[in-house]
């Protein structure tokens, strides 16, 4: 009942109005899986390749007809007749057929869409929700947890058209007793933040991930206005709500220095920028910092881990790009203590699960993440619960492409009840 009988690829539109790949996998029992590949703005140089057409007459060169053709042609032919329940085999067939180190032949967007669609179809054929099927693929059947959300309520960097250098300022509703309550707290703080910004005459337009994108005097001011909003919403900063940041520092790393254009082009060495961040953690209850230095600055990261690694969570995104080879090297060298998991960075579900397992086995945390270019596909919600990852980053409290994931988590929590505990701050490394 779970043999693949048909695979369809198509070009659809993501949350930024750019094309992406959607795949449909049909099984002989009439079961169907549908999945779409997300797309990033600030991307690590070692990510698997997102194949774009480059034809300037269509979608400004961003079309994905080549990737779609790969789905409908060689990929479909290779997986027809194969058992969708054998995820590792499906993914291996596609990866081997592609034959490149970074999936540049077919595109990680093509391979991932089929990989996820096959998993969804297999779950349907087993008569179980996707998160349950993922837990079985993960070798942890029946082991679930609800993730602590990191909600990106102020967007800067590559995610917004403003003068804020640091890409994401996030809140974590750690005082919540459930995922549903965490979403409510996040929503209330988000709405109070709008009032705080308006009172200061600041813009409340939103960025790619649904957070506000005002022009601010400094990066520290972003933390200050969030602190004000938390208080206005009736919560205590540090107790009910903690803070997190994604620096995406590779985006402002120029000629060996970290240059904050929004702060008068202040330039920092790796050590100086580490202490700049350390000062912020002393002023505000920041418990997690992602990509605090450039992806290639491993010596700097070793220093940053030494200074901050026993106090807070240091997440590698561009640093590790969900790649087990790079993560293994990072673990051996004691770089960071957490990995961001974006399945389109590596391009298949099997490899994503391997990265999560490697991180957990080494005592690193794993934070499941969206991309800035998303669709209504909410697979990452099931991935977070099915791997009991403990943390999720899926944007702010606006834009359906973000909220779709929170709504799916609410449904899953309702279905699982006490089988999926919400552990809050305990999930964060160093807390």
Swiss-Prot record:
Kindly list the positions annotated as binding Mg(2+): 246, 290, 317
Any one GO MF annotation of this record: phosphopyruvate hydratase activity
Q: Which domain of life is it from?
A: Bacteria
Q: Where does (2R)-2-phosphoglycerate bind?
A: 167, 342, 371-372, 393
What's its catalytic activity?
A: (2R)-2-phosphoglycerate = phosphoenolpyruvate + H2O
Q: What is its main location?
A: cytoplasm
Function as written in the Swiss-Prot or TrEMBL entry: Catalyzes the reversible conversion of 2-phosphoglycerate (2-PG) into phosphoenolpyruvate (PEP). It is essential for the degradation of carbohydrates via glycolysis.
- What is its quaternary makeup? Component of the RNA degradosome, a multiprotein complex involved in RNA processing and mRNA degradation.
Name of the protein this chain belongs to:
Enolase
Q: What is the lineage of its organism?
A: Bacteria, Pseudomonadati, Pseudomonadota, Gammaproteobacteria, Enterobacterales
């Amino acid at each position: 009942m779970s043999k693949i009988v048909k695979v369809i690829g198509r070009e659809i539109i993501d949350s930024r109005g750019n094309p992406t790949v959607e795949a449909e996998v049909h099984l002989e029992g009439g079961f169907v899986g549908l999945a779409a590949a997300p797309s990033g703005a600030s991307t690590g140089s070692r990510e698997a390749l997102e194949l774009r057409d480059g034809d300037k007459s269509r979608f400004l060169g961003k079309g994905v007809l080549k990737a779609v053709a790969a789905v409908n042609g060689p990929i479909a032919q290779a997986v027809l007749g194969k058992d969708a329940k054998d995820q590792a085999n499906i993914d291996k067939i596609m990866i081997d057929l592609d034959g490149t180190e970074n999936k540049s032949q077919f595109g990680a967007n093509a391979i991932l869409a089929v990989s996820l669609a096959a998993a969804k179809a297999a779950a349907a054929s087993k008569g179980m929700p996707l998160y349950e099927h993922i837990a079985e693929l993960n070798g942890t059947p029946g082991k679930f947890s609800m993730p602590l959300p990191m909600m990106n309520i102020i967007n800067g960097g590559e995610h917004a058209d403003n003068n804020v250098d640091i890409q994401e300022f996030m809140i974590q509703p750690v005082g919540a007793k459930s995922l549903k309550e965490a979403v409510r707290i996040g929503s209330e703080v988000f709405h109070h933040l709008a009032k705080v910004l308006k009172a200061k005459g600041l813009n409340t337009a939103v960025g790619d991930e649904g957070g506000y994108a005002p022009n601010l005097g400094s990066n520290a001011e972003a933390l200050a206005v969030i602190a004000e909003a938390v208080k206005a919403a009736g919560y205590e900063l540090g107790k009910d709500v903690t803070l997190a940041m994604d620096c995406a520092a590779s985006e402002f790393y120029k000629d060996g220095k970290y240059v904050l254009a929004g702060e008068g082009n202040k330039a920092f060495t790796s050590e100086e920028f580490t202490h700049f961040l350390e000062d912020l953690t002393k002023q505000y209850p920041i418990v997690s910092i992602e990509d605090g230095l450039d992806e290639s600055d491993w010596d700097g990261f070793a220093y940053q881990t030494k200074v901050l690694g026993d106090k807070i969570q240091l997440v590698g995104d561009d640093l590790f790009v969900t790649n087990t080879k790079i993560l293994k090297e990072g673990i051996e060298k004691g770089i960071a203590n957490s990995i961001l998991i974006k399945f389109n960075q590596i391009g298949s579900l099997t490899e994503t699960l391997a990265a999560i397992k490697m991180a957990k086995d080494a005592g690193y945390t794993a934070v499941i993440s969206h991309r800035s270019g998303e669709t209504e596909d909410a697979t990452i919600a099931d991935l977070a619960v099915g791997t009991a990852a403990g943390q999720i980053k899926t944007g702010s409290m606006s834009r359906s492409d973000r909220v779709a994931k929170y709504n799916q988590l609410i449904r899953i929590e309702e279905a699982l009840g006490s089988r999926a505990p919400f552990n809050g701050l305990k999930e964060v490394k160093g807390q």
